[in-house]
């Protein structure tokens, strides 16, 4: 990639690449940076040659549009391309991007399991949920602590001699009341969630 050219006489927008200028220049090659005809000299990028990046028009997030006279965002001077590529150009406004980004990212990144709090891909969601629900809760042995043993990581208070504790199979120890509260919501050791 070459160096970025700058000119003192050209004004800058508060956000690079965002402008009210509505011009886009079609690319002469399949993927690259191109100068637009507007005052800002904005760039358009064609992603039509990138495999798997040709979604239907209804699935495109705001700011991405197909070039061509029959599209909602693609019409206008200088944006037509015989290949019908997908462009991100000066027509992509900051408001459009901020409006769609949280929903688009959330829809494509999976979900957080309410049982184990792991992030799971959306195609594995059902199987993961079944596995989490069928996993048995950890059992523990309750005991009375014979000597001071550091800190309970749930309540962050000291484990003192004489406290009623719970010892998990992984040998972690907690106040019995703390781990009982923890197991009402979770099914794993607070320090070893993957076990």
UniProtKB/Swiss-Prot annotation:
SUPFAM superfamilies: RING/U-box
Record field: compositional bias (Low complexity): 18-29
Pfam families given in the database record: zf-RING_2
Listed GO CC annotations: cytoplasm; endosome; intracellular membrane-bounded organelle; lysosome; membrane
Pathway: Protein modification; protein ubiquitination
EC identifiers of the protein: 2.3.2.27
Gene3D superfamilies tied to this protein: Zinc/RING finger domain, C3HC4 (zinc finger)
Biased amino acid composition, Polar residues: 1-10
InterPro entries attached to this UniProt entry: Znf_RING, Znf_RING/FYVE/PHD, ZNRF_ubiq-protein_ligase
Lipid bilayer topology: Peripheral membrane protein
Keyword Zinc: yes
Lipidation, N-myristoyl glycine type: 2
BP GO terms, sorted: proteasome-mediated ubiquitin-dependent protein catabolic process; protein K48-linked ubiquitination
Chief location of this protein within or outside the cell: other
The record's note on its domains: The RING-type zinc finger domain is required for E3 ligase activity.
Compartments, record wording: Endosome; Lysosome; Membrane
Species for this entry: Xenopus laevis
Protein's job: E3 ubiquitin-protein ligase that plays a role in neuron cells differentiation. Plays a role in the establishment and maintenance of neuronal transmission and plasticity.
Region annotated Disordered, chain positions: 1-37
Superkingdom, natural source: Eukaryota
Name recorded for this polypeptide: E3 ubiquitin-protein ligase ZNRF1
GO molecular function: ubiquitin protein ligase activity; ubiquitin-protein transferase activity; zinc ion binding
Keywords, sorted A to Z: Endosome, Lipoprotein, Lysosome, Membrane, Metal-binding, Myristate, Transferase, Ubl conjugation pathway, Zinc, Zinc-finger
């Amino acid at each position: 990639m070459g160096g970025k050219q700058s000119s003192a006489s050209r004004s800058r927008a508060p956000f690079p690449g965002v402008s009210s200028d509505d011009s886009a220049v079609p690319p002469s090659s399949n993927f690259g940076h191109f100068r637009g005809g507007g005052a800002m000299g904005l760039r358009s990028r064609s992603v039509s040659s990138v495999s798997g990046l040709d979604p239907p028009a209804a699935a495109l997030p705001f700011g991405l549009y197909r070039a061509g006279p029959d599209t909602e965002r693609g019409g206008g001077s200088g944006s037509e391309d015989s290949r019908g590529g997908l462009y991100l150009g000066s027509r992509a406004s900051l408001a459009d991007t901020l409006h769609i980004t949280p929903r688009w990212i959330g829809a494509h990144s999976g979900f957080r399991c309410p049982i184990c709090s792991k992030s799971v891909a959306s195609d594995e969601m059902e199987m993961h949920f079944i596995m989490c629900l069928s996993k048995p809760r950890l059992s523990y042995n309750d005991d009375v602590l014979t000597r001071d043993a550091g800190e309970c990581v749930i309540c962050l208070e000291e484990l003192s001699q004489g406290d009623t504790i719970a010892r998990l199979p992984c040998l972690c120890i907690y106040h019995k009341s703390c781990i009982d509260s923890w197991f009402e919501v979770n099914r794993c050791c607070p320090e070893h969630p993957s076990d």
